[in-house]
Amino acid sequence: LEKEDITGNVCYDNLNHANMTRNRAQKIQKLQDIIPDLAVQGKSDTLVLGWGSTRGSILTAVDILKDRGVEVATCHLHHMNPFPKNLGDVLRAHKQVIIPEINTGQLRLLIRSEFLVDAIGINNLAGRSFFVKELADEIEAAMKGGAK
């Protein structure tokens, strides 16, 4: 079931459905023109990329790492579909990308498939936010090549 292109009438035509699906995808992609560029905080070869409720935990963990003398860059996604235009450039500007998530790593899978970046996931399945010291320890371990 689809609306007919131009008239908006109900239409069951396969070709019309394909056309309308492409139209919707193009409209979504055009949103990239108004989505602000992704802002990166800090300078480092390692980027910690977050989204959603991980923001506070990531920022606090990064502060803990700075106190330890470990430099980490961070940024936070506010838009997922489409991604900000500069996301690919931001990812490629860092040798290592770490993505803490309170799930099984769906964003990491999207980043890996869309941008071919071998991002490292830190996944929390405890049903609560990250403990910031624990997250800082896991980020530092990932930076050294080992997962905790």
Regions found by a protein language model. Give the residues of each.
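Flexible, low-complexity linker and terminal segments
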Residues: 1-148
